[in-house]
Amino acid sequence: MKLLPELKYSKDHEWVKVIDGDVVYIGITDYAQDQLGEILFVETPEVEDTVTKGVDFGVVESSKVASDLISPVNGEVLEVNEKLEDEPECINEDPYENWILKVKLADVAELDTLLSDKEYEAGLE
């Protein structure tokens, strides 16, 4: 299982990458994509929608199951990765390169409530 130390993680298997101050990418972890199997479809919110920490913002459908995407932060959706519409399986190929949402955080301090790579990994054991 691949984890990146520069990312923050949620117990719900999402990762957060700070790209510019209060702007982040959100995606699912390598562990999550492995558990899901081949990803067939990703349902996402619209640009300018609000995401709420701990609340689902979309669904990932795979060959095995449909699973809710749970937001690790509060914020406003700035962009949705349009590549996922035609190539949702790209998440299986590289879950950390193929983000789902670009979000402007409501509060940067929320990042401190997320897990480090080591804490996330320990929670899987």
UniProtKB/Swiss-Prot annotation:
Membrane spanning segments where? none
Domain Lipoyl-binding as annotated: residue spans:
23-104
Task: Provide the assembly information.
Answer: The glycine cleavage system is composed of four proteins: P, T, L and H.
The name this protein goes by in its record: Glycine cleavage system H protein
* The protein's role, per its UniProt record: The glycine cleavage system catalyzes the degradation of glycine. The H protein shuttles the methylamine group of glycine from the P protein to the T protein.
Its family?
Belongs to the GcvH family.
Specify the superkingdom. Answer: Bacteria
Question: Which cofactors does the annotated protein need, by name?
Answer: (R)-lipoate
What does this protein's record comment on cofactor binding?
A: Binds 1 lipoyl cofactor covalently.
Q: Which UniProt keywords apply?
A: Lipoyl
Q: Which GO terms describe its cellular component?
A: cytoplasm; glycine cleavage complex
The UniProt record lists the keyword Metal-binding: no
